[in-house]
Amino acid sequence: MITADLALTRLKEGNRRFVSAAMNHPHQDKERRNEVEKGQQPFAAVICCSDSRVPPEILFDEGIGDLFVIRLAGNIVTDEVIASVEYAAAHLHVPLVVVLGHAGCGAIKAALAYTGEAEGHIPTLVSVIKPSIAASAGRDADSVARVHATSMADKLRKSTPLLKPLVDSRALAIVSARYDLHTGIVEIAP
């Protein structure tokens, strides 16, 4: 069983390979497909935006079955996302959850520009991001994205009786991070 520290190191090393264009492209062959057909054992869970420019398996140079990925616009944490993380932690025993925000997030920009009028379910998305706007030192999208990823990680740590004991016992670490679209670097928050 891998520890949270080792999982985080593995993600950082994979991101370094991605940034330097020296990717290994692991676990992307027929043998791996056959292996994971029997079950999955991801070493980390990643909650990230649905933005097509933010594919965690590529950013971290991982392959099929390595990451348990939950994608939702604005990397928001809803009850459904919490349930998915609970499944990953309690049943798949992932030791690490990363809430990954990113530069240029359209959901954050939409929440900043929101005037109270929108059709459909977009106001639901905006309502989850608005507290991060209020808590942000600035009103620019990048500042809000950083605060928002940290806020969503905090929400996960505190909001569920299933995750809190795992975090308290250090069986699970929940961290926030930010992906820079220009440099390719994923920066883990302190």
Question: Could you tell me what each predicted segment is?
Answer:
Residues 1-39, 65, 75-94, 106-190:
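Divalent-metal-activated hydrolytic enzyme cores
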Residues 6, 44, 49, 53-60, ...:
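Terminal alpha-helical anchor/extension segments at protein ends
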Residues 11, 46-47, 70, 176:
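Conserved small-residue
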Residues 48-54, 73-76, 102-103:
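Short glycine-enriched loops at secondary-structure junctions
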Residues 61-69:
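Short helix-loop-beta junction
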Residues 99:
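Conserved functional hotspot residues or short segments at active or partner-binding sites
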